[in-house]
Amino acid sequence: MKKTDGEDKLLSISQVAKTFGIHQDTLRNWEKKGLITPLRVGTRGDRKYRPEDLEKIMDDMSIVKDLGLPEADDGKMNLTQLKQFLWKSADILRGKIDSSDYKKYIFGLLFYKRISDVWDEEYEKVLAEFGDTEIARADYNHRFQVPKDCRWEVVQNEAQNIGQKLNEIFDKLTNANSPKLDKIFDDLDFANKDKFPNETIQRLINHFSKYSFGDTYISSDLLGDAYEYLIEQFAADAGKKGGEFYTPREVERVIVNILKPHEKDHIYDMAVGSGGFLLEAYHYLKDVAGEKKARTLYLYGQEVNLGTYGIAKINMFLHGLDSASIERGDTLSDPKFLNADGSLKTFDICVANPPYSIKDWEAETFKANKYGRITGYEMPPKKNADFAFVLHMVKSMNENGRAGIVLPHGVLFRGGAEGRIREQLIKNDLIEAVIALPAKLFYGTGIPAAVVIFNKNKSEARKGKVLIIDAEKDFEEGKNQNRLRKRDIEKIVSTYDSFKDVEKYAREIDLKELEENEFNLNVRRYVENGDEEEVIDVKSVWQELAVIEKERDAADKKVEQFIKELKY
């Protein structure tokens, strides 16, 4: 057979994958759409591709090469490759949509691709076992229901109105999986052509079509870890708004390692954000006791923001934690986790990083005290919701409950109603520890925060005492963001566990000393952090000032002389 011109430069399917990171399913999809035509080479008619044809398509779609993606023979990405791949999907939208907004669209598409590919895998597995298409399609053989007209291939083959088709598919998926997927896609509108021209959505679809996201190729742990990475990257990208849905994992780790979840614990986050605290609790127990026991945890969370609620739900699903109960609503005015008699449900562990110092909140509804949250306490200020969150958390702890909450430092020392609430919490012996964190740990703010640990069942040795820890100096400095290192986390946790004084770092304070200090919990009041006060030599300073003044006078005279010479 005559050799095709330039045959030596043609690429096989596996070579295309190695060179360009393009999955064979993506190639076939391009062939169906007429974007590329393979050459038939050799006696067997092997399919080969011209590199220049592939480069043209990739340039048109702005697909990035050299991601280090695996060959198409196994189609599996490792964690680093998966992180890169997912972050590249954001590049397609970056600059077209506000950085704080496009994350939910990426997450929505990723989740849709995942459940569609998993459905296909489940179908093929059951079909191979029973040889019956009806059984293979049966609802009970699938974790999520994906109707035929909702499969990923449907949007792959849609040419004109992809955005509208996606909206229709998300509605159908929600209905087919209600109440499991209720509200998850409600904040997405791909049909807005000002935001999403057809070409932009097509590029997103083509990008996600490169690889299968089924369980065979990407495990729940791998995809879950990559999803959490993506959340963190979006938080960094969004700046100040990033702090609204993301708490640094190191801070979550401090609190969870202090509270130490046990098998079958009920864990609640009243301001769940993207779900990081709940997942950290799961990861903690998985590390210390194994996955089987970690999956016995009961996880609960409430989130007021619709888009963030969807992100949290997807986060749980991608980690395989389908039983996690995430509800949408305002925790302070409309708490969702209630007992049959309408009272607040209580939990073994409560965790939260609520929004700081909200001025506009449903104070009047809270004051009505429907859930008994201010019984025994004063009403928090109408212009600051910090202690409203604290009192909600305290009321949500069961009789043996432990809790950890991230708060602004003002909560530790402000007076008025807040001071009286703090006094009562201390007298009720509910506060176990206060930990001052370094500045610039949180996205969008350089203000340092504190962690307050509550315990309704203190050990005898800790009753009537509060441990104050000053961890402000222990961190790794970054350009825009500081981080707690592993050793910093371990130091905080071990100090809490030992509950003993550590010079210039921690002090155990009794109720008498707190009372003498008017129940002020300001960390600097109790812990000398090692900063030596600068000794000022007044005489030397005056001498330096006199020299500076003489130099200034001489400069003024020169300026006056110049002005005279210029005849101004």
For each feature predicted by the language model, list its residue ranges.
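Conserved S-adenosyl-L-methionine
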Residues: 241-352, 357-368, 373-377, 387-388, ...
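Non-catalytic, mostly N-terminal accessory regions of nucleic-acid modification and defense proteins
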Residues: 2, 6-10, 15, 19-25, ...
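Residues embedded in well-ordered secondary-structure elements
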Residues: 5, 288-290, 441
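A generic secondary-structure signal for well-formed alpha-helical elements
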Residues: 113-126, 234, 285, 289, ...
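Alpha-helix initiation/capping motif
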Residues: 75, 194-197, 215-219, 244, ...
